[in-house]
């Protein structure tokens, strides 16, 4: 008996993808062994980056240009109609064509071979900045040319003016700093280079004249019986500007700079004239030296018994008086205010020292060293068979400290002698 037809089954056409739908090329069901629709494999072309100077240059041994490849992730999964669908619309790699002996660049209309295993890579190269690349390019051309160009001769070279030919420029060039220094004729500020040459001049004074004056100054100073320190004091007395003995010594030995020697020379010339004409100059210098020593050293103040007792009375009333009180005490005792102030400072420091000494002699227990020597020190003996670890106190006024014995037999009865384990376990 025939079964009734419940549904009308119409035949459907085979399901096919449109050419615009992109499928996954890595899926196994779209390989060539399966009857699946084909689709065009896309190419992602990454062109070579042009240089900053426009056209591509010929590769040199030092260039870092990377090779340009097309972006093909699946070179071994190729579809039959790939080449046909990719013939138009995709950019092609740049190529070089030679026409009439010149190198030119153009674009090729042919796509790369689909069967070639291409590796994805970026057309990227490392390069210097534009301002530095031009310098390096010029240097490279100079090196590759073989160095036929000879270095130019220095214009400062004396041999160049004579026309004797090429010579080493390093030996002939004179640094600009040294030449300008020689033209100015200034001395070095270092003390070891006091003489710069016989032609050094400043304010109409040459170095030879300065050397002669320094030698004359030393001879006259020794003949008149003056020391280098006396000259410094004499300049302070006569002209109000005192110099040290070291400065006069350096002037005589030409260890000062030429500029400083020119400033000091007029004062020394005036001193020479004053020393030759004034016989009392030596006495004036001697008095000035004595007064200077007296100003540096102050006389020590001595207090008699009555004055000291009065100061002690004021100290017992107020150990730290103020400025007004110090002035009143100084007027009362006919002393200077600074003397009274210093005495109070010293007296307070003395009081602090006494307090520290008294605290240092006392022990922690409050006994003084005299009481310890007078008392009889006795120590309590420690029993030999005792289980405690007590020690007698070393201080005589304190009782000895005995800690309780360790309860060994109570906590650990099995450790007591004469008791077996059977008795404990019972």
Swiss-Prot record:
Recorded name of the encoding gene: pou5f1.3
Location relative to the cell: Nucleus
DNA-binding region: 296-355
Function: Transcription factor that binds to the octamer motif (5'-ATTTGCAT-3'). Antagonizes the activity of nodal/activin signaling during gastrulation to suppress mesendoderm formation. Acts maternally to inhibit vegt and beta-catenin-activated gene transcription, probably by forming a transcriptional repression complex on the promoters of target genes. Binds to an octamer motif in interspersed RNA.
Tissue: Expressed in the animal half of oocytes and remains localized to the animal cap and marginal zone of blastula embryos. Expressed in the adult ovary and at a very low level in the adult kidney. Absent from primordial germ cells (PGCs).
Segments forming domain POU-specific: 202-276
Gene Ontology BP term (one): negative regulation of DNA-templated transcription
Subunit structure: Interacts with the transcription factors tcf7l1/tcf3 and vegt.
GO CC list: nucleus; transcription regulator complex
Biased composition (Polar residues): 154-168
A GO molecular-function annotation: sequence-specific DNA binding
One Pfam family this sequence matches: Pou
Keyword tags: Developmental protein, Differentiation, DNA-binding, Homeobox, Nucleus, RNA-binding, Transcription, Transcription regulation
Region Disordered: start-end pairs: 82-118, 140-203
Superkingdom: Eukaryota
Compositional bias ranges of the Low complexity kind: 103-118
Annotated S-S bridges: none
Family: Belongs to the POU transcription factor family. Class-5 subfamily.
DNA-binding in keyword set: yes
Major location category of this protein: nucleus
Protein's UniProt name: POU domain, class 5, transcription factor 1.3
């Amino acid at each position: 008996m025939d079964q009734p037809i419940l549904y009308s089954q119409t035949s459907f056409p085979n399901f096919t993808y449109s050419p615009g739908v992109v499928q996954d090329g890595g899926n196994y069901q779209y390989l060539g062994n399966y009857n699946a629709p084909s689709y065009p494999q896309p190419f992602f072309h990454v062109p070579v980056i042009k240089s900053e100077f426009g056209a591509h240059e010929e590769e040199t041994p030092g260039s870092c240009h990377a090779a340009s490849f097309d972006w093909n992730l699946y070179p071994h999964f190729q579809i039959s109609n790939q080449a046909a669908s990719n013939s138009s619309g995709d950019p092609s790699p740049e190529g070089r064509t030679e026409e009439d002996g010149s190198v030119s660049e153009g674009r090729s209309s042919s796509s790369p071979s689909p069967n070639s295993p291409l590796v994805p890579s970026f057309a990227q190269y490392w390069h210097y900045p534009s301002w530095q690349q031009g310098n390096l390019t010029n240097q490279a051309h100079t090196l590759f040319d073989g160095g036929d160009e000879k270095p130019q001769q220095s214009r400062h070279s004396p041999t160049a003016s004579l026309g004797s030919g090429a010579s080493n420029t390093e030996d002939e060039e004179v640094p600009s700093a040294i030449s300008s220094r020689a033209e100015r004729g200034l001395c070095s500020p270092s003390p070891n280079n006091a003489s710069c040459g016989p032609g050094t001049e400043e304010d109409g004074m040459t170095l030879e004249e300065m050397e002669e004056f320094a030698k004359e100054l030393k001879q006259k100073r020794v003949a008149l019986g003056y020391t280098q320190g006396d000259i410094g004091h004499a300049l302070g007395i006569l002209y109000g500007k005192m110099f040290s003995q070291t400065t006069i010594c350096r002037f005589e030995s030409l260890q000062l700079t030429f500029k400083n020697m020119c400033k000091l020379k007029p004062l020394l010339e005036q001193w020479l004239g004053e020393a030759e004409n004034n016989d009392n100059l030596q006495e004036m210098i001697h008095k000035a030296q004595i007064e200077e020593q007296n100003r540096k050293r102050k006389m020590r103040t001595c207090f008699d018994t009555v004055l000291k007792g009065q100061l002690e009375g004021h100290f017992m009333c107020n150990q730290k008086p103020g400025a007004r009180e110090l002035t009143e005490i100084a007027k009362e005792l006919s002393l200077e205010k600074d003397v009274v102030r210093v005495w109070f400072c010293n007296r307070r420091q003395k009081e602090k020292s006494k307090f520290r000494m008294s605290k240092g002699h006392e022990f922690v227990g409050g006994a003084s060293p005299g009481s310890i020597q007078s008392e009889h020190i006795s120590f309590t003996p420690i029993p030999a068979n005792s289980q405690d670890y007590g020690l007698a106190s070393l201080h005589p006024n304190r009782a000895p400290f005995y800690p309780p014995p360790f309860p060994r037999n109570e906590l650990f009865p099995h450790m007591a002698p004469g008791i077996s384990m059977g008795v404990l376990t019972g």
